Amino acid sequence: MTKQTILHLHPFCNKDNSDFIFLPAGIVGVINNLRKNYFKIISINVPLEMKLNPNKNIKEILKKINFKIVIIDCHWYYFLYGAQEIAKICKEINSECIVIVGGFSANFFRKEILKTSKNIDVIIKGDSESLMPDICKDLIYKGKNALTKFPNIIYKNRFGFIKDKKITYFDNNINKFDYIDITFMRHWKEYLQFSQGVKAPGISQIKKENEKFFYLPTQKGCQNSCPSCGGSKYSYKILSNKKEISVRSPTNIIKDIKKLKDLGIKKLMISGESNLNKWTYILKELKINKIFLNIIFEEWQLPKKEFVKQMISYAKNTDSGFIISALSGNEIIRIKNGKHFKNNKILEIAKIISKSENSYVSFWFAPNLVGATTKHFQETISFAKELLELNVLAPKPNIDVLIGPMEIDLTSYVYSNFSSFSLSEPVWNYKYFIDFLKTKPEGEKLGNMSFSSKHINIKQCNQLCEDFKNIILTMKENIEYFRGKKVYPLDKNLEIKDIEIKNYGVFLTILNKSNKNI
């Protein structure tokens, strides 16, 4: 079979903004399955090309490529405008090309996009790894009329009417696909040198140190119902018709990590529920086989103690640890926002890590949660201080607490049902997104679509975040001073029963367990 060329484009935000170079995990699996089915792929990461050479003319690059089918990923809302602009450029070069767009944001606004854009032919919904080769093959040999037979798509028929087909096709076995190999992409080696920027998520910048970074996908779907999250159980139901989560096997994850190590990757980001992939076993195997990378594990719920202890063991040779969204110090508010664990369980995990000289954990909180008030946030501050106090006598200060506004994801339950939440600020509609992204400057935050209720508006939320940061900074300074002075009770008969950190010092309650004066 003669290989047919398919052009894949990762879009910019706008022609002057190259911030978000990172590929969605799903498109890597889609492209690699096309390659497996004998398609030739030319993949260009447009914002990456802009970063590497700001003077490059993207249109001139594309003119040199003979393409009939273009695939554009549009997973995050950041690309809603840019994906359409890139499609327009492709149509200007080859008016007969067929442009396919996929991803959660394109899916969510699929009707708005097709009504307003003349340059996008098909938007694919739900799973597309196995479906895409069949769609591309029929489009190449039969043209757009072939679209009538396929599920999971929306398109305009020859009369200009929008046909929104049902999602009936699923790729539930994600062990069949390759989400690791990105060598199909132009300048993939340079891509691996980029890491998350310090200003905001997604704003990428070249790291000065030589630590190649990779986000490792291990799960598709979610079994949690966090109301503000765009990747929740609700989100997958409305956008992919998925009712169950798909997980990658431990064997395949270990193989993936071996491949990444061979590519020179030093740092992995993993996001999911560790018990679903048996991560305790995975880390044991990695350690036995001396496969050591720095792992940041973003745990969607709370890791099991066995996994925490195994991470501590693995971290003897690496800088590996956890990020956990504790969200609130109030347990009822935490549960309302999709996290089903209590304060005492958080403290148990924190104490295990605190007693070790390895690993770390960062707990993330937010003031503007569903159902939360300023009173609840005072509980959050108190609980965050209790966690941070563990650093006073720890072998090393490896407990951290972070704060930030809870953003409303585009594809979340809150966004789709905003009238039920008495929001004090309107959510952004499609037109607002397009107008905002069209002129968004490079290097700045995406925006502030924070959850804003009658209890905590955006201005109050931002101020509460600043108050939290100042309180925690003062605590950290006091802890650092205390640790530097090393004023620990050295006698084995003395036991610290209580620690209280105030603005002017660290106060200890010490129990003398002996009958003698010490």
Region spans (language model):
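Canonical Radical SAM [4Fe-4S] cluster-binding loop centered on the CxxxCxxC motif
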Residues: 203-249
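Conserved SAM/AdoMet-binding glycine-rich loop
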Residues: 2-9, 13-16, 69, 100, ...
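Catalytic cores of alpha/beta
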Residues: 112-116, 371-386
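Glycine- and acidic-residue-enriched helix-capping/strand-helix junction motifs
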Residues: 15-27
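Glycine-rich beta-alpha loop elements in corrinoid/cobalamin-binding modules
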Residues: 42-172
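Flexible glycine/acidic-rich beta-alpha junction loops that bind and position SAM and/or redox cofactors
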Residues: 16-17, 224, 237, 279, ...
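Radical SAM enzyme core and accessory elements
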Residues: 1-8, 59-68, 158, 434-518
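N-terminal [4Fe-4S]-dependent radical SAM core
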Residues: 7, 14, 156-218
